[in-house]
Amino acid sequence: KTSNKIGSVGQPLAGTSVRIVDPETYEELETNEQGMVLVAGPQVMAGYLNNAEKSAEVLIEKDGITWYVSGDKGKLDEDGFLTLIDRYSRMAKLGGEMISLGAVEQLVRPALIDQGYLGDIVATSVEDKRKGERLIVLLDEAFDQKAVIDYLKKAKANSLMRPSSWIQVEEIPRLGAGKVDFPREKKLAAELV
């Protein structure tokens, strides 16, 4: 029996339970199906101090067990290995479909690199009256938008994952540690669209 698998974060520690559930209904999903990661065990907090509202956002009771709602999208394989796919906070809902913003970035990066683009790429979503949300990509260098769109069409990229707007910005918003500031990035995109 293997003790690790490439791409997996491993198996839960002894005494820890992990479930993959539908993010809206919290119904448990089958092996290898992607969904919300729930964690239970003695290490899970009882709640936020003096903040029942915040506690109710991240803790649910199911089958007599308190589960922490991680916000991560993942899957469990047949051997109990957990693979994390993305964060649900980094997802967009377009016409009822959940789209990973990280996957959008991975999709457009080769198209941009093919055009000689070496800058940062950050995908986000903004509200859309027709589809619920629409995809926006922020970039911090000049690029040939038509060439990138043509590349994605030729590659037969899923049309749902193709950004509707490409916006060049002076700089991508970042936190003090250098990581992308996703809330500021989303706000900036909404202001510029």
PLM region spans:
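Generic structural signal for residues in well-ordered beta-strands
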Residues: 18, 120-123, 165-166
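Conserved beta-strand termini and adjacent loop/short-helix elements that scaffold enzyme active sites
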Residues: 21-23, 124-126, 169
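Flexible lysine-rich "adenylation lid" loop at the C-terminal edge of ANL adenylation domains
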Residues: 26, 157, 169-189
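Short glycine/proline-enriched turns and hinge-like loops at secondary-structure junctions
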Residues: 29-33, 86, 132-133, 179
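Regulatory helix in c-di-GMP signaling enzymes, encompassing the GGDEF I-site helix
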Residues: 152, 166, 178
